[in-house]
From Swiss-Prot:
Its cofactor is [4Fe-4S] cluster. This is tRNA-2-methylthio-N(6)-dimethylallyladenosine synthase. It catalyses: N(6)-dimethylallyladenosine(37) in tRNA + (sulfur carrier)-SH + AH2 + 2 S-adenosyl-L-methionine = 2-methylsulfanyl-N(6)-dimethylallyladenosine(37) in tRNA + (sulfur carrier)-H + 5'-deoxyadenosine + L-methionine + A + S-adenosyl-L-homocysteine + 2 H(+). One of its GO terms (molecular function) is metal ion binding. PANTHER family: CDK5 REGULATORY SUBUNIT-ASSOCIATED PROTEIN 1, MITOCHONDRIAL TRNA METHYLTHIOTRANSFERASE CDK5RAP1. [4Fe-4S] cluster 1 binds at C12, C49, C83.
Amino acid sequence: MTKKVYVKTFGCQMNEYDSDKMVDVLNAAEGLEKTDTPEDADIILFNTCSVREKAQEKVFSDLGRVRELKEAKPGLLIGVGGCVASQEGASIVSRAPYVDLVFGPQTLHRLPQMIDARRASGRAQVDITFPEIEKFDHLPPARVEGPSAFVSIMEGCSKYCSYCVVPYTRGDEVSRPLDDVLTEVAGLADQGVREVTLLGQNVNAYRGALTAGSTDIADFATLIEYVADIPGIERIRYTTSHPKEFTQRLIDTYAKVPKLVSHLHLPVQHGSDRILMAMKRGYTVLEYKSVIRKLRAIRPDLSLSTDMIVGFPGETEDDFDKMMALVHEMGYDTSFSFIYSPRPGTPAANLADDTPREVKLKRLQHLQATIEENVARISQSMVGKVERILVEGPSRKDPNELAGRTENNRVVNFPAPLASHPRLIGQMIDVKINHAYPHSLRGELVLVSDDASTATH
């Protein structure tokens, strides 16, 4: 009987990418297949996030629930990976003695060896070292599921914002060699991937050697240009970027590379220079707005999303008003916004914070409501227009229909003859948007490529 692995992912897209790699590593080494049901699993892994306290505590809550599964199935192995593992290390085993494996983001490729050591010794295995780029040298080729894929181009972050734990849990910035990234993207394209999202904690800081050991360096703009030249790749996205390193070279890339989507996630974190300074972000609101102004001069239709922290220590009503003014001016088309959560070991955790929780919550609700209104307005403005989408697969709402994604990252559901589904999936097609809903759009097929056209008859 085929053994199975269950992975629960918390947090960012980097973690989603790492979770897929965990499955790939265990499939290549031990033939394990992925399952969506923990009760069916022989190995249960939690890929964790420590950016906010709530996410961290939820991991231990989930661990408590799977403990019962291990009692019923003694051979079951339980592992904790990701940023909580990197931060907490062996203390996870002290708190939850039934955990067998603790590994960091940089050591997931060692899972097979850790499993062997656990079975041989009967003792929990902990490996949260930072072996830099070694991870990518030991990962098997990706197994593609659909026409979109993530590709990690670098690890870690060297910005050390005062509130952020990432540099301590993922290490400093280390870039993959250019040819290594291009080889992975080309392999994905050969398997039918049409859209890649280049991943990193701060992709703007990418400085990859042209080849392993080379002293010649490629910046992020160069990487994008090379990826765009790979046959089969139709769209390029990236996340996450940092305003401080959004260079003119990168801005100019939006004029040179049509495959680079007109959708940008650029975290601002706050709209007050005073708070940005306390956060150690390294830029002002005016500098942030200057980047967006230059980008929109090239791409007037640029869709913008961001991250925002409400209730940072010392935030006044005036600071929050400045944040809201920026929201209105930028016209954000999504924001990942949260109340500030102090993380142990970060400088901001020691700052005095006298703003009541109720005030922070009220501010957050106001911010999120304003952005939701803007999201609805943008979605409604798309009704009646023809949008180019990448068809990703059957619709979640109705498997008899198909779903694709627009450049500004909206899901579009549309009807298509069942016989055409296999041929349409993975293609770029045009749809006319007929309806806008809170979290999706609905449209109709209006124009497809010659290959897809024959599939609809």
